Design a protein with these regions (language model features):
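Histidine- and acidic-residue-rich, metal-dependent catalytic cores
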Residues: 10-263
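Extended, charge-enriched "interface" segments that sit outside catalytic cores
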Residues: 1-13
């Protein structure tokens, strides 16, 4: 039992440690690019190898951080959510790794958007919105300079495309949008709605899912959204109203179920 509890604690600690690592990765990306990209690639591999062997546990640990004011958790949240969908769809390992890298650095182009636009709490002017929307192309330029794989660049450049062709930057439609970007789009909006931002409180889970389904077939690929919907709600329902001791017991049970070597 002690080993099981220690394993659960390690997984919880790993989430926080990984988020802190992402903070450092983003900070060092342009000043020390080669080493930073290698570090990020190893980080994605660790997420794939460790977190995704226990998707329920990972989703719980992540959900406990939703609403955090530490915005670098967003990159990890959307990476994990995207990889969970990819895992369920049984995508090849190379695709999953590239999806993770693209998700981790999806907003790298925002560093070229002035803070007065990016952090503005009032509605943007049309000129400000047009400038902000350039972050996808800026990000792809940075990714190409850093020699990101094409599949990772797909996520960075196309994550704001919409299934009906009304997104940006290229107004791609349907399956012309890379699958990795279609997966990421659902994860990105889910986390944005679920998280506390300077201008809003997090929405309840049921409300978030209702908003996502309003975009089924317009904003989101229906099949990807259906997969995400199947993966997301069960654990959240389990966790409602649990106190600290009950949550710890649930975590331990998940470790027992998903890490057979410990049982």
């Amino acid at each position: 039992i002690r080993r099981q509890r220690e394993a659960a604690a390690r997984i919880e600690a790993a989430f926080v440690d990984t988020a802190r690592t992402i903070h450092n990765v983003e900070k060092n990306l342009l000043t020390n690019p080669t080493e930073t990209v290698e570090q990020a690639s190893r980080l994605v591999g660790q997420i794939v190898d460790s977190f995704l062997t226990a998707p329920d546990l990972a989703l719980h640990v992540m959900s406990d951080k939703i609403g955090s004011e530490e915005m670098y958790f967003h990159s990890l949240n959307v990476t994990m959510l995207s990889l969970m969908v990819a895992r369920d769809l049984k995508l090849p390992g190379e695709v999953v790794q590239c999806l993770g890298m693209g998700a981790l650095f999806h907003d790298v182009g925002c560093r070229k958007v002035p803070d007065k636009i990016r952090l503005k709490t009032e509605p943007w002017t049309q000129a400000e919105r047009n400038f902000y929307e350039l972050h996808c192309e800026y990000g792809a330029e940075i990714g190409r300079e850093l020699k990101f794989a094409p599949l990772a660049l797909d996520v960075i450049e196309q994550h704001h495309e919409m299934f009906d062709g009304s997104g940006y930057p290229r107004q791609l439609r349907g399956e012309a949008i890379p699958l990795s970007a279609r997966i990421f789009a659902v994860a990105d909006v889910f986390d944005a709605l679920s998280s506390r931002r300077p201008y809003k409180e997090p929405l309840p889970f049921d409300k978030v899912m209702a908003i996502l389904h309003e975009g089924r077939g317009s904003h989101f690929d229906p099949s990807v959204l259906d997969t995400f919907t199947r993966l997301a709600p069960t654990l959240y329902a389990q966790l409602q109203g649990l106190d600290e001791a009950s949550t710890r017991a649930l975590l331990t049970d998940m470790v027992q179920r998903h890490f057979d070597v410990l049982v």
